């Protein structure tokens, strides 16, 4: 069984890989690998360059050199996350990524944000069964501290999720949402002309 087949199996409950007898052990091995890498990430100081290398190993995808993260950080699976360029992830974030998490360029993620791509079946007889849907955060969105984004949500470009929000449905581009559950608060005025470079970190991270 391959990693790509496993990723696809989370996206499609009818995927043939879900019936592969090797799947449970393969999944557990990859999760344990993630625990080891996360312990390495979170236990001692690392330079920004070292964190990029560690996160590339965790995700098994090349993470761009512009990526910045402040530990601690944990992911349930770790192998189904895609980071764009100039992404910043603040301390204490938790990613439940089995269903797939895609984070676009220039995204800012505050302290203690939870991205959860899984949910349990509501039927008591099936309550141990998990269902997965992806989370997509489009370019230049800002996710406020202590917010939670649930499975199947797409956060639009240049949108803002207020601190402490619980997002259960898609967020339109150029909007601010907040509350539990998150609701529309206001529009964001677009003051960036097309093609204008954005000074993401201004040298302070």
Where are these regions (language model features)?
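Conserved catalytic-core motifs of eukaryotic protein kinase domains, centered on the activation segment
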Residues: 119-121, 125-128, 153, 187-188
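Solvent-exposed, flexible loop/coil residues
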Residues: 45, 77-79, 99, 126, ...
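Generic detector of leucine side chains in alpha-helical contexts
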Residues: 3-6, 30, 39-41, 58, ...
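Terminal amphipathic alpha-helical/low-complexity segments used for targeting or macromolecular assembly
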Residues: 1-66, 182-186, 192-205
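Left-handed beta-helix
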Residues: 65, 70-71, 76-79, 84-85, ...
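Generic anion/oxyanion-binding catalytic loop in active/binding sites
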Residues: 23, 126, 131, 148
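Generic preference for well-ordered secondary structure
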Residues: 18-21, 25, 39, 51, ...
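Short, glycine/charged-enriched secondary-structure capping and boundary segments
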Residues: 124, 130, 175-176, 190-193
